[in-house]
């Protein structure tokens, strides 16, 4: 399951570093590995692309669901995310500003539902909820 970091890199495929992400995704797909595009990661990336007026990157993002599995947020995901957030707060593990919606707990809830590993640039906070690994560590 893609976190917003790798997803953002996949949409900005023109930069040399980002070609690594494209090659990585292609290798996974060539070996029939299920790759998931969670709605919350789409939201995080999309809002920044809109602000920056990156229409080419938006087109790349829009094309991804034809290649990989798009995962909409469900009510059950939001309930699980609330549970994860509350448990984390009660045990003293910060998940960000309590007044803000936390995308990481929503992403974690989606990954839990699907039994997926999150491919990310930043394992930190996600690892307290679900299996999360650096994208480059997820190999065939």
For every predicted segment, state its role:
Residues 1-37, 47-63:
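Short, well-structured N-terminal submotif of metal-dependent ribonuclease cores
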Residues 6, 41, 77, 107, ...:
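Alpha-helix capping/helix-boundary segments
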Residues 27, 108-140:
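Acidic, PIN/NYN-like endoribonuclease modules and their adjacent C-terminal/linker elements
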Residues 27-28, 64, 88, 129:
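Hydrophobic helix-cap positions at the C-terminus of alpha-helices
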Residues 34, 67-69, 131, 136:
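Conserved beta-strand segments of alpha/beta enzyme cores
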Residues 40-88:
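Active-site-proximal, substrate-binding regions of enzyme catalytic domains
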Residues 69-117:
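Active-site neighborhoods of divalent-metal-dependent phosphate/nucleic-acid chemistry enzymes
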């Amino acid at each position: 399951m893609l976190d917003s970091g790798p997803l953002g890199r996949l949409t900005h495929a023109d930069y040399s570093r980002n070609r690594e992400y494209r090659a990585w995704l292609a290798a996974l797909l060539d070996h029939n590995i299920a790759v998931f595009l969670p709605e919350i990661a789409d939201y995080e990336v999309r809002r920044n692309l809109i602000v920056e007026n990156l229409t080419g990157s938006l087109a790349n993002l829009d094309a991804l669901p034809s290649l990989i599995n798009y995962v909409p947020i469900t009510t059950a995901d939001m309930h699980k995310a609330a549970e994860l957030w509350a448990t984390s707060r009660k045990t003293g593990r910060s998940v960000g500003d309590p007044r803000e919606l936390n995308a990481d707990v929503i992403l974690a809830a989606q990954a839990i539902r699907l039994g997926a590993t999150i491919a990310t640039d930043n394992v930190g906070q996600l690892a307290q909820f679900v299996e999360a690994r650096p994208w480059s560590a997820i190999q065939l």
